[in-house]
């Protein structure tokens, strides 16, 4: 990991601790996902709230969910040229996701 003097040291150390703390099974899974790519069957369009960890809310592991975070979990009408439509198209056409969840909540932000 590249070190930047302005970047909070606790996050650099936290990442190092996370990598060192991976079990053999977890490490093998991440290596597999890195080599073979992801194959999520579910896409979630959620808000950008940093308090919400979408895969954790469903007890899902790495590579299981394709997550798009967007302000207010909005999905614009068809025909608008935007990154959200591109992400949905990618999820459906490239990953063949079978389900799309649009998830919002009160008191966001």
Regions found by a protein language model. Name each.
Residues 2-82:
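Short, conserved "active-site rim" segments that organize catalytic pockets and cofactor/ligand binding
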Residues 79-95:
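Thiamine diphosphate
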Residues 100-109:
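Active-site microenvironments of hydrolase-like enzyme catalytic domains
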């Amino acid at each position: 990991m590249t070190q930047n003097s302005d970047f909070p040291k606790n996050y650099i150390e936290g990442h190092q601790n996370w990598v060192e703390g991976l079990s053999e099974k977890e490490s093998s899974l991440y290596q597999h996902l890195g080599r073979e790519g992801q194959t999520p069957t579910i896409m979630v369009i959620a808000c950008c709230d940093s308090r919400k960890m979408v895969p954790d809310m469903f007890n899902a592991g790495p590579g299981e969910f394709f997550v798009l975070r967007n302000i207010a979990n909005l999905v614009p009408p068809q025909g608008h040229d935007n990154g959200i439509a591109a992400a949905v198209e990618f999820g459906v056409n490239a990953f063949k996701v079978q389900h799309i969840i649009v998830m919002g909540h009160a008191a966001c932000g």
